[in-house]
Amino acid sequence: GTGEMIKAALDLGVSKIIIGLGGSITNDAGAGMAQALGAKFLDAHRSEVAVGGGQLDQIRMIDISGLDARLKQVEITIASDVDNPLTGINGASYVFGPQKGATPEMVQQLDQNLAHFAELVSKQLNINVKDIAGAGAAGGLGFGLMVFAGASIRSGVELVIEHTQLAEKIAQADYVFTGEGGIDFQTKFGKTPFGVAQVAKRLNKPVIACTGYIGEGVEDLYNEGVTAIFGIVDGVCDLPTALENGERNLERRCENIA
């Protein structure tokens, strides 16, 4: 897991770690990661809780006395592709839970569990970062990394834009093409097409987005720099067929746009 990978990096003696947070199957606010690095989570009977998103509500005490001391000696940066907070309607559970198979009832419980965990962190560790943009990334791992690893957080797409000098390249372009597997209401929460569109908007360049599917809420993107959005699938087909023909479908759609 992530905690084990951080520990391995510490064993190698690194001074800087960049952790990319995107999709995950977890929803535990980084508690599992923290356990791997030496933290303990105890229930009302002072027994250690086997942490998962469904067990966070059992925790009554957070013990960080055994947390790996080397964490204080490294600079850890989170590169997040979303800016969701930990909890609430735009938080980890409500936005990403359904993608992981959570039912509406499960989503509500998971969100309550994350809120409980965040309250414990606030009261016992005097750290309150649940509302920071990106805290909800990867099932709340952004939150856990800030709390237990002292990580700072940056937009993943901003890091890429900076290192690739994208703004300079867009300034010389007539049109900007971007895209991802699916474009919907989540895209505006820091996904790559949104970041690209923001740069292009500042430079008054039109942005054309191509995507495997167009979901709900894309209308907001038209106010954020996106000029047009095109789906690349020509007709009704199943997912394996769409994936198999993705490259050709994208090529054909771009030819037609041109």
For the regions a protein language model found, what residue spans apply to each?
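N-terminal loops that bind phosphate or other acidic moieties
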Residues: G1-L21, I25-A258
